[in-house]
Amino acid sequence: MTRTTVDELVFFVNGKKVVEKNADPETTLLVYLRRKLGLCGTKLGCGEGGCGACTVMISKYDRLQNKIVHFSVNACLTPICSLHHVAVTTVEGIGNTKKLHPVQERIAKSHGSQCGFCTPGIVMSMYTLLRNKPEPTVEEIENAFQGNLCRCTGYRPILQGFRTFAKDGGCCGGSGNNPNCCMSQTKDQTIAPSSSLFNPEDFKPLDPTQEPIFPPELLRLKDTPRKTLRFEGERVTWIQVSTMEELLDLKAQHPDAKLVVGNTEIGIEMKFKNMLFPLIICPAWILELTSVAHGPEGISFGAACPLSLVESVLADAIATLPEQRTEVFRGVMEQLRWFAGKQVKSVASIGGNIITASPISDLNPVLMASRAKLTLASRGTKRTVWMDHTFFPGYRRTLLSPEEILVSIVIPYSRKGEFFSAFKQASRREDDIAKVTSGMRVLFKPGTTEVQELSLCFGGMADRTVSALKTTPKQLSKSWNEELLQDVCAGLAEELHLAPDAPGGMVEFRRTLTLSFFFKFYLTVLQKLGRADLEGMCGKLDPTFASATLLFQKDPPANVQLFQEVPKGQSEEDMVGRPMPHLAADMQASGEAVYCDDIPRYENELSLRLVTSTRAHAKIMSIDTSEAKKVPGFVCFLTSEDVPGSNITGIFNDETVFAKDEVTCVGHIIGAVVADTPEHAHRAARGVKITYEDLPAIITIQDAIKNNSFYGPEVKIEKGDLKKGFSEADNVVSGELYIGGQEHFYLETHCTIAVPKGEAGEMELFVSTQNTMKTQSFIAKMLGVPDNRIVVRVKRMGGGFGGKETRSTLISTAVALAAYKTGRPVRCMLDRDEDMLITGGRHPFLAKYKVGFMKTGTIVALEVAHFSNGGNSEDLSRSIMERAVFHMDNAYKIPNIRGTGRICKTNLPSNTAFRGFGGPQGMLIAEYWMSEVAVTCGLPAEEVRRKNMYKEGDLTHFNQKLEGFTLPRCWDECIASSQYQARKMEVEKFNRENCWKKRGLCIIPTKFGISFTLSFLNQGGALVHVYTDGSVLLTHGGTEMGQGLHTKMVQVASRALKIPTSKIHITETSTNTVPNTSPTAASASADLNGQAIYEACQTILKRLEPFKKKNPSGSWESWVMDAYTSAVSLSATGFYKTPNLGYSFETNSGNPFHYFSYGVACSEVEIDCLTGDHKNLRTDIVMDVGSSLNPAIDIGQVEGAFVQGLGLFTMEELHYSPEGSLHTRGPSTYKIPAFGSIPIEFRVSLLRDCPNKRAIYASKAVGEPPLFLASSIFFAIKDAIRAARAQHGDSNAKQLFQLDSPATPEKIRNACVDQFTTLCATGTPENCKSWSVRI
């Protein structure tokens, strides 16, 4: 039968019909929205469906359910060819700044948007939930964001704002009209409450009847027979069929064709593995592949059923069927719970997950263990197979023949006497790739505890999903008892072997997990047998073991934010000290805020793609561009030979714009391809072939130490008599601590647009950078023109965190060269994997310490040698090391001290500035040895910390006097507000009663110096224009990256000029308004630029004074007009430099810092000793921010910094190969904290009555200081591990053990030594290369 074929794509976007006659299967919805439709609210954050910045809502008529359905998707993975006859809603389609949707309004007014780059995606996730359920529960709201990431806020304000939609306890914002208000949950009565950061009563109510309707044209097509779709692109053909007959015919004709439903796997392979599939078949319309049927054996799911449907059907079955029939269903549901975000589960199919045959699949081990049955078909044949150990014959292979397809899968009902569990351990619970997954099933002989069937299946333990076929048969007919447990564990340890260089690494951890999972399964079954009155046959469960079977659940959140209200009588127009929302919050929430890549494309614009080294250290022997030139749209390939000025660049002139003869790291920029589109530039860049001659490479800190490979002389501070101090000490402890690096993971990657002006060498650049001055000067030097020909503009950034302070110039110089060479505008926005590969991150540190102390815990001597991995250029590494050594004392007075620092020169991408700038590393080392002092002395750690704490007027080890030392106040307040002593007793009680779960509690202080340590950078400038209508245009030297700097500066100007903030506007930061600016860094930008603005405003006010005296009853506008008509200038510059700064390392004298910021955090955690997973139960923070300029922004900075620190110290881990290649290049492999990672109880209090006389309006810096407080989580984890080690008889349990940072599940599990870790201890054979190395 011949069917009609359609080659015209029809869909709707925000209610408008789109007809695309030339649909390209390689074009994603994200590209189409941004480039073709100009809808730039939807952002590119990662390109792999891992961050949610591109989230949009899809609506379609579901013919099986006979209703309109709404679901969220990742536009970056959604092919436009899959959108025929559906409706797409983007953030622009639900509201705008003239009329915000309630979702947009609430995230803006609750201060849930900082840099704003992630905001549209989060808005659309929430909007989609409300379209499906206008009155969701708190849990449903939190689950809606499993596929979204935010790097700025710390998530609390987003959740708090959106919980106002919940029917079961939304926040009232402290208004007192909700019994579930999180502020009323605090037990602390020692601090007076403050008014709320926002008032939910101001929010518009949600009215579901006012939402846009589903396009009637599409509704009319619901019963129309579907026609085959065929779209042919430049390289790929897409065919969407609606009958099984068509599909099987096509598969017979084209056995290599790929079947795509959600594109969550194929899309990744095409983008990141450069795989090309010339024919793609979409079977999403076929009835047999999308149907669900309840049969006698179980529930049958069509292979194209999305996982969200599987989840929904299984949930209904669990709710309605007897418990004994749903054991398998609950196991599958547990895996789906953590599988991925809604955006992926809405489109990814169950069949796709099976056929992908991933060795680390979440579902395949569970389905294999469950006795799932699969139906396969090809033209003319159909067969049914069990999904057993034979189904996956090898890596990414199944037993399907090339022309076969998977039709359906039956997930079976469980039988009487059958028990089932599913397990998964990853770096992060939410939306993470598993390290190990498992499905476990046992069937007992009727009325006994004798094993009739046992199935133990694992992912992550081989190149395929495996079943423990050697171990399980030996257990048949055995009783479920301790003897069986020991036999199975011994068998698994022997059977499930991993080579030391196994992909993914973590060999001992993964092997231990298999035993831990079975032990959990054993205990779970034991509990259920007890409930079935069979306990006597198998033994009684130890009550302290019971919690080992409990999964970490999401508990109701309890968040508190306390701050000092403004004085009574302060003018309503004076916004200083008030929780004013971010100036751009409404624009960010509506998608109207313009970021660099959102700037409309120029008519003749070109695209650039970098070509980088694949070797860590090598000579460049040849560059072949012949294949690149064959790509359509190719324009040119740029190398060092094309640079008209200097190819030498970098802070210390030790870098190149393009590598010339030699590369010194993987990711070293060799050249750049320029083409007509980003896609063509990408393809052409892949076509550039480079041959190398390898040279010896230095990758790790240890390699550098061994080879004496360092940058410059050592940094050194010494005070007192170290030899005498150690000789007088009662105890001396020595050790090492390694602190891993960290990726910035700003949601907006590096982006530059260069526009040549066509005369006198002028060029205008739009750059996502924190450092306009260096961007300007580096480009001018490269082009061989004066700085005054280059104008650099920054509207806003989608996050920075130090990563755009210097490394942005790597991209901007290349783009500027391309614009110079072609005479046309050129744009480049790095893909996430490129950005992570090229731009470096936080410096890894290795510290070797020796501390001397008395029995009382008093520190008398300290020596620390710090080593950092600087990478292939010096960049800012020296200043970072200096700050680390400045902060090696943290908050403690140490009479005899020596700190040294060496920067290792290695063949890695240069590491650079990152929030904290070396301070967190120096302070973590301090708290590490401090905790060891407490353990050695047998004293409470909080007592030892308090005993050694500085006092007012003390001199630091670098001889700066501490004035206004509020840290003891912060400490005492945190001890009280956290109920530390009572909770410490509760933790000890919990640990006595639970063997396999342990809790830890720790309180940590911080003292952070404020100023650039390079003293001349401590300057700020401003330009203030007052127009004749009284409006003010404000410009200053700082850039906005989400920290609220522009908002605070408007507040400063408003108070200074005594006018409303509504009259003041900031357009951008640019080099042609405020020249020679310092980078927006060091937490000093509000201090420097705020004072400069104040000075400029005072100049304006002085000029207006005569007119105010002449007309005292006049208005601001009248005084301004009078000044104008009197020919008085209404424009003024302001300048400020921080006084009395300057430090000499030679004499250990002077003041490196203007003042210090202080804070204290108390955190409680619970660890799962069997898996290494942990849950952050509660954090209390007391932070001294002086007299806050804006409590909402400051609390947001405290929370955001803390959560970023939580990632640094417990989660984020960079993996490099021994050859220096980065494995972790995106959100699928590199995990930052997610919504579910933050403390369940998160309480932040700004210290009251502590004005800071050294900064604008008595405020203090806040961006960096709170980050280190997240180490309280790290040390709470370490305390919990210590309790676990004591439980399991480690003779050294109450002494010292190693825990490097970050405290990942692998490190936690391996540190909780027990019988399972002993069974799996292997060690690495000599001369064996591991999968990754500790850099």
From Swiss-Prot:
Keywords: 2Fe-2S, Cytoplasm, Disulfide bond, FAD, Flavoprotein, Iron, Iron-sulfur, Metal-binding, Molybdenum, NAD, Oxidoreductase, Peroxisome, Secreted. It is found in: Cytoplasm; Peroxisome; Secreted. It comes from the Eukaryota. It catalyses: xanthine + NAD(+) + H2O = urate + NADH + H(+); hypoxanthine + NAD(+) + H2O = xanthine + NADH + H(+); xanthine + O2 + H2O = urate + H2O2. Substrate binds at residues 805, 883, 917, 1013. Induction: By interferon. Subject to partial proteolysis; this alters the enzyme from the dehydrogenase form (D) to the oxidase form (O). Contains sulfhydryl groups that are easily oxidized (in vitro); this alters the enzyme from the dehydrogenase form (D) to the oxidase form (O). The active site is at 1264 (proton acceptor). Binds 1 Mo-molybdopterin (Mo-MPT) cofactor per subunit. Residues 7-94 form the 2Fe-2S ferredoxin-type domain. Key enzyme in purine degradation. Catalyzes the oxidation of hypoxanthine to xanthine. Catalyzes the oxidation of xanthine to uric acid. Contributes to the generation of reactive oxygen species. Belongs to the xanthine dehydrogenase family. Homodimer. Interacts with BTN1A1. This is Xanthine dehydrogenase/oxidase. It comes from Mus musculus.
